Amino acid sequence: MTEGIEGLPKLYRELADWWPVLSTPEDYAEEAAFYQELLVSTCSFVPQTLLELGSGGGNNASHLKQHFRMTLVDLSPGMLQVSQALNPECEHIQGDMRTARLGRQFDAVFIHDAIVYMTSEADLRSAIRTAYVHCRPGGAAVFAPDHTQENFKEETDHGGHDRGNRAMRYLEWAIDPDPQDDTYLFLMVYLLRQGSGQIECVLDKHICGLFSQDQWLRWISQAGFEAHAVPFVHSEFGPGSCDVFVGHKPLTAKD
């Protein structure tokens, strides 16, 4: 991952205020329910507090906040601003999931697909370590990458929404130009229209990490969690299409 805000894709910098047009909270209802049930079933107690690292525009949080008292951390000021408008009752903190240290622990920690921007072993292990440090003993952490090496397939998708006087349409293409390395490319083309004005076309390149299930489980375990993989269950995804990684922090953990 390129260091700092300047290394983020355009979607999280100059286009951040277009996020609500690209992606709506309603799109996240089903998967947020899956994550909520997984967090609750993994914890040794009924979790009350949840830290989300890489919380983005807050769409998952808009559902999870019905069940947890949430603190949301993201590197992008623009995305935090979008999330604050959607989730004013949640605490928002600007920070990097690799290095953030809030000085307190939470019953559970959640990292959604923002984890894919960890493009090296060092970056991913740092993010997992952040989750461990902030997780209360007996609590749970859930990591939800879009792909592992075992299930990656080249794919395309398209969609968009109208919102107020803005409209967006997009095309996305996930490809792996070099299967020998630990990254893949997620290319996005946005067509943006404001009011009755001209349509602007923007290309945005996302470089994403691609690791094996064994690497995920090993690094989560080495951080101190009891680790296992869980098939992601969603009506729009076939069985075995992707995995979610879960860490349970032992009740006897000292850190």
Model-inferred region functions:
Residues 51, 57-100:
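Class I SAM-dependent methyltransferase SAM/SAH-binding core
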Residues 107-123:
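A short SAM/SAH-binding and catalytic strip from SAM-dependent methyltransferases
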Residues 207-255:
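C-terminal lobe and adjacent flexible extensions of AdoMet/dcAdoMet transferase-like proteins
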